[in-house]
Amino acid sequence: MNPHAKLISIMSLALGTSITISSNHWILAWTGLEINTLAIIPLISKSHHPRAIEAAIKYFLTQSTASALILFSSMNNAWSTGQWDITQLNHPTSCLILTMAIAIKLGLVPFHFWFPEVLQGSSLITALLLSTLMKLPPMTLLLMTSQSLNPALLTLLAVSSALVGGWMGLNQTQTRKILAFSSISHLGWMIVIIIYNPKLTILTFIIYSLMTSTVFLSLSQIKVLKLSTMLISWTKTPMLNSTIMVTLLSLAGLPPLTGFMPKWLIIQELTKQEMTPVATTIAMLSLLGLFFYLRLAYHSTITLPPNSSNHMKLWRINTTPNTPTAILTVLSISLLPLSPLITTLV
């Protein structure tokens, strides 16, 4: 991809995200979402592979549909109440349409089918952007309107996402699809608490972004796209594979790693809100995700006997130190002792 085109796309992503998260008017927020959509499409299709082109088309169709629904929801609310302010979403039909639109944007169940396919057709770095940065604008809109939305509907979407994200990730062999279903499952945890404690949703999103960035950057460094390739990478980069294993366990939410903190706080908050059945259900559903995280961790640390490979130049792996990955790894596995301080700040 042309470096200038890549720079323009990245700058447009930053611009679109900034516009959406800082605006109070629906038209400005919609404009930022559209800039984001148009900026990420060249990054998805940069390899010119048929799968990448297909992923870009799927992404464009789903995101444009969701953006149209957001615009329709805001116009319907303005027609009924005379308000274009994002926080003044009071019309019930507008609230329902907006919930559906943001569910499509985020890839929540039952509007999740596009997300694994788009990630599978993208490079690892583009998949990282789709899993973290591109979730930020719709999540911001959801945070700003959460007090107007239906709690029962959001809880249903959250529990369904945790169930489907864990269940459909069990049988996957492609790392990008596994991480896509991981993202859907984590979104369920964020959505279930968004009405009762929005700051906890922000904390969960930040920690999820840290852990997911670590995994994607590490996989990109050792050029692993599927489990069978991960099996033969241990002998070449044992230290990096070890950090991937620990980060995956953190992503699964095992103590004493960082990923345990948001799940613990969410279950605690749900119990305070007298939603113990929901807390129990979503905690049990996280065991499904734990299975495929352990599967990934297991594949990252076992070795195969010497065998021939069809991959060209597989042994030529860049082993230069990667400072961002190292910093993200430390944050992804060691923040749990600081949880009292973090919760105080948030």
UniProtKB/Swiss-Prot annotation:
EC number from the UniProt entry: 7.1.1.2
Highest rank taxon of the organism: Eukaryota
UniProt keywords, alphabetically: Electron transport, Membrane, Mitochondrion, Mitochondrion inner membrane, NAD, Respiratory chain, Translocase, Transmembrane, Transmembrane helix, Transport, Ubiquinone
Signal peptide segment: none
Transmembrane segments: 25-45, 52-72, 95-115, 124-144, 149-169, 178-196, 200-219, 247-267, 274-294, 326-346
GO molecular function term, any single one: NADH dehydrogenase (ubiquinone) activity
InterPro entries from the UniProt entry: Complex_I_Subunit_2, NADH_DH_su2_C, NADH_UbQ_OxRdtase_chain2, ND/Mrp_TM
GO cellular component: mitochondrial inner membrane; respiratory chain complex I
Catalytic activity as recorded in UniProt: a ubiquinone + NADH + 5 H(+)(in) = a ubiquinol + NAD(+) + 4 H(+)(out)
Any matching Pfam family: NADH_dehy_S2_C
Location of this chain's protein in the cell: Mitochondrion inner membrane
Membrane disposition: Multi-pass membrane protein
Top EC category: translocase
GO BP annotations, alphabetical order: mitochondrial electron transport, NADH to ubiquinone; mitochondrial respiratory chain complex I assembly; reactive oxygen species metabolic process
Family to which the UniProt record says this protein belongs: Belongs to the complex I subunit 2 family.
Role of this protein: Core subunit of the mitochondrial membrane respiratory chain NADH dehydrogenase (Complex I) that is believed to belong to the minimal assembly required for catalysis. Complex I functions in the transfer of electrons from NADH to the respiratory chain. The immediate electron acceptor for the enzyme is believed to be ubiquinone.
Listed name of the protein: NADH-ubiquinone oxidoreductase chain 2
Organism of origin: Coturnix japonica
